[in-house]
């Protein structure tokens, strides 16, 4: 089995890229890419995932920060079960852009599994397509800001077919800078598949402001990760 993201990163480094960011927003820890580049200070891996206490592969805790000489380049945010749209978006926006600004990547490679969705049968996060789409659009903006628009977006896991279809459609829409409603009609040929039903945003998402990341009561996972990682980059930790 081949790791498509790792192969792409290796190719980029071999063809002139100096620094590459791998951003994994799947429900599972991005352990494969992290392990391959554990000792490489030129690759920054960021994984926002459900805690290994509850979900395979059982790794990806805040204290896992990279090998000798590459400390601070493995970033892990281990979330508890039941994390909501707003909590997840707050964590993503608090962690990712400050590190991108410091690391100054030549390329961003991101992995967008659909299993953080609340209907997924394996994971226990409580995200809607609306929140996931907001994150995808944010990655597109960050790629423009910090990587001269050089962004490779990959699909990933997901175990409910309509959630996968809607999530990946939103990834494509974000990469094309197109706004697409999460309630857009599925193709007629798919009508026999289970459907998500009402995809209304959870409370707070409609008014979510990424510039106002919670500071007074930051999420515990955010505190743990920033305390472990941010000092390596001269950034103030939360909490």
Where are these regions (language model features)?
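A general "terminal functional-core" signal
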Residues: 1-239
């Amino acid at each position: 089995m081949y790791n498509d993201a790792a192969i792409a990163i290796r190719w980029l480094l071999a063809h002139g890229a100096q620094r590459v960011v791998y951003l994994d927003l799947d429900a599972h820890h991005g352990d494969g890419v992290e392990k391959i580049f554990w000792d490489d200070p030129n690759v920054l891996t960021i994984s926002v995932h459900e805690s290994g206490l509850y979900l395979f592969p059982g790794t990806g805790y805040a204290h896992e920060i990279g090998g000798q000489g590459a400390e601070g380049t493995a970033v892990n945010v281990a979330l508890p079960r039941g994390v909501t749209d707003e909590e997840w978006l707050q964590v993503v926006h608090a962690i990712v852009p400050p590190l991108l600004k410091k690391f100054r990547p030549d390329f961003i490679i991101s992995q967008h599994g659909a299993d953080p969705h609340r209907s997924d049968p394996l994971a226990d996060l409580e995200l809607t397509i609306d929140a996931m789409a907001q994150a995808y659009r944010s990655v597109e903006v960050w790629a423009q800001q910090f990587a001269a628009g050089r962004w490779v977006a990959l699909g990933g896991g997901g175990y409910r077919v309509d959630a996968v279809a809607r999530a990946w459609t939103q990834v494509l829409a974000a990469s094309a800078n197109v706004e697409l409603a999460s309630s857009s009609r599925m193709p007629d040929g798919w009508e026999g598949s289970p459907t998500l039903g009402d995809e209304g945003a959870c409370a707070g998402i409609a008014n979510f402001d990424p510039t106002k990341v919670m500071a007074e009561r930051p999420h515990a996972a955010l505190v743990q990760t920033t305390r472990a990682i941010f000092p390596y980059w001269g950034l103030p930790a939360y909490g």
